[in-house]
């Protein structure tokens, strides 16, 4: 079993984001990825990660109003595991690599292949951008963050677009507002990091946010969900080799 620690916050308590790569113990084993609901931990990350290696997990492929899901049951040994969520559901669209190998409504025991632990700031200091492109009231534009990374292994640039929020702006003022937002963002954003959770996430740490970012609060870590952005086997490599170079902001008319 492999294990990886992505450390974005050094302190206790911290918010733990745990993701696990699994293979079903089945005649036609499917590969899948599940992630636990965020939880707050007081155990040193190295100890928590070590106890996560004792995980036993079963999954059940099911349906819901929002689409296919995986129902997850988990157990593990160790005192730190008392705070670990034991029953939860995850989006099957992100979790599953191979739909054709899954049996509907069948409880399946899984073998844990890889455990990822990402540490973030404590509750109250972690926020999330909701990645929704649905119309919101009379909003006219979407604020998009273009996060630039460098793949240090291949020495190639990678840009990830992330939806931030919807805003109301007159078309004649959009260029001026976009410039102002860019200036505010330069002061607000200090760093971004890729981490394995819900497929893949980007963690942006805010510092002295102003204007459109001021509600986020100084020092807040913001999660941007990227979903099934890459194949599961590439996640650990990306977390190690992608370096944040900078973030640009653009306004896109709805």
UniProtKB/Swiss-Prot annotation:
Modification after translation: Phosphorylation is important for oligomerization.
Function: Plays a crucial role in virus assembly into filaments and budding. Early in infection, localizes in the nucleus where it may inhibit host cell transcription. Later in infection, traffics to the cytoplasm through the action of host CRM1 to associate with inclusion bodies, the site of viral transcription and replication. During virus assembly and budding, acts as a bridge between the nucleocapsid and the lipid bilayer.
Cellular component annotations (GO), alphabetically ordered: host cell cytoplasm; host cell nucleus; host cell plasma membrane; membrane; viral envelope
Entry keywords, A to Z: Host cell membrane, Host cytoplasm, Host membrane, Host nucleus, Host-virus interaction, Membrane, Phosphoprotein, Viral matrix protein, Virion
Motif (Nuclear export signal): 194-206
Any one biological process term the GO annotation gives: virion assembly
Subcellular location, record wording: Virion; Host cytoplasm; Host nucleus; Host cell membrane
Organism the protein comes from: Human metapneumovirus (strain CAN97-83) (HMPV)
Protein name as catalogued: Matrix protein
Pfam hit, one: Matrix_Pneumo_N
Family in the record: Belongs to the pneumovirinae M protein family.
Membrane topology, record value: Peripheral membrane protein
GO MF annotations in UniProt: structural constituent of virion
Residue ranges of the region described as Interaction with M2-1: 1-110
């Amino acid at each position: 079993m492999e294990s990886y620690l992505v450390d974005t916050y050094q302190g206790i308590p911290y918010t733990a984001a745990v993701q696990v790569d699994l293979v079903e113990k089945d005649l036609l084993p499917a590969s899948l990825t599940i992630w636990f609901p965020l939880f707050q931990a007081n155990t040193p990350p190295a100890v928590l990660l070590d106890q996560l290696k004792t995980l036993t997990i079963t999954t059940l492929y099911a349906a819901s109003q929002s689409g296919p899901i995986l129902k997850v049951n988990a157990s593990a040994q160790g005192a730190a595991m008392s705070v670990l969520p034991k029953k939860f559901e995850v989006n099957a669209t992100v979790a599953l690599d191979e739909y054709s190998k899954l049996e509907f409504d069948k409880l399946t025991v899984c073998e844990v292949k890889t455990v990822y632990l990402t540490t973030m700031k404590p509750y109250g200091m972690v926020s999330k951008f909701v990645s929704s492109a649905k119309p919101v009231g009379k909003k006219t534009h979407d604020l998009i963050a273009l996060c630039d990374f460098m793949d240090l292994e291949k020495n190639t640039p990678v840009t990830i677009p992330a939806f931030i929020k919807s805003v109301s702006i007159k078309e004649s003022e959009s260029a001026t507002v976009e410039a102002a937002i860019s200036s505010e963002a330069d002061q607000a954003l200090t760093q971004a990091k890729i981490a394995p959770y819900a497929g893949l996430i980007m963690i942006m740490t805010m510092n002295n946010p102003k204007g459109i970012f001021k509600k986020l609060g100084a020092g807040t870590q913001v999660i941007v969900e990227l979903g099934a952005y890459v194949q599961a086997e590439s996640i650990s490599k990306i977390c190690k080799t992608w370096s944040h170079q900078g973030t640009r902001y653009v306004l896109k008319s709805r």
